[in-house]
């Protein structure tokens, strides 16, 4: 849909605070959609400030690197679904938004899309308009960290480390 009201909000916690949750989500989506799409220094600074305000960037980038490693294309970036946004902005919260993917039945080669494992991980969404990822990748620092995490989670030694057992 063209507006955020076209989508349903399935509040999982604090259900008595639906109105404020809707307002917070609306503000986030509006700000995200109004971010610049060019790569001027001023635009990059604006985009970076937005992401650093809303996200724990290391957590977000690591989450998406793991999503890609698992071949999770039935998600926000691929199909625009199967994720939660958790706003930890209450009195005792971190003030951050957490992106939480779910529904991993189409992973590890069980995808309806052939050759997902051959895709460039920086173009995972197959050209779809996904402002959350598109804007983030415009920031060189975030893009590089994302690539670094992709290498880190796919490194052979990361998958085959000997477990350490305490006696």
Residue ranges and their predicted role:
Residues 1, 7, 76, 83-86, ...:
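Aromatic side chains
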Residues 1-70, 122, 156:
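Internal "kinase-insert"/substrate-recognition segments embedded within catalytic cores
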Residues 12-15, 19-22, 33, 90-167:
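C-terminal catalytic region of ATP-dependent kinase domains
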Residues 51-111:
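Active-site acidic catalytic loop and adjacent metal/ATP-binding pocket
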């Amino acid at each position: 849909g063209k507006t955020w009201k076209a989508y349903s909000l399935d509040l999982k916690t604090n259900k008595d605070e639906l109105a404020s949750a809707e307002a917070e989500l609306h503000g986030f989506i509006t700000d995200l959609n109004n971010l610049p799409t060019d790569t001027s220094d001023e635009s990059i600074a604006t985009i970076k400030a937005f992401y650093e305000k809303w996200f724990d960037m290391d957590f977000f980038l690591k989450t998406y690197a793991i999503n890609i490693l698992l071949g999770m294309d039935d998600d926000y970036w691929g199909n625009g679904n199967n994720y939660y946004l958790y706003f930890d902005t209450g009195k005792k919260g971190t003030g951050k938004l957490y992106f939480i993917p779910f529904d991993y039945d189409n992973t590890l080669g069980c995808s309806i899309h052939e050759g997902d494992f051959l895709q460039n991980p920086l173009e995972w969404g197959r050209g779809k308009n996904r402002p959350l990822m598109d804007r983030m990748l415009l920031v060189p620092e975030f893009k590089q960290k994302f690539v670094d995490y992709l290498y880190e989670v796919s490194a052979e030694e990361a998958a085959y480390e000997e477990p350490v057992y305490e006696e």
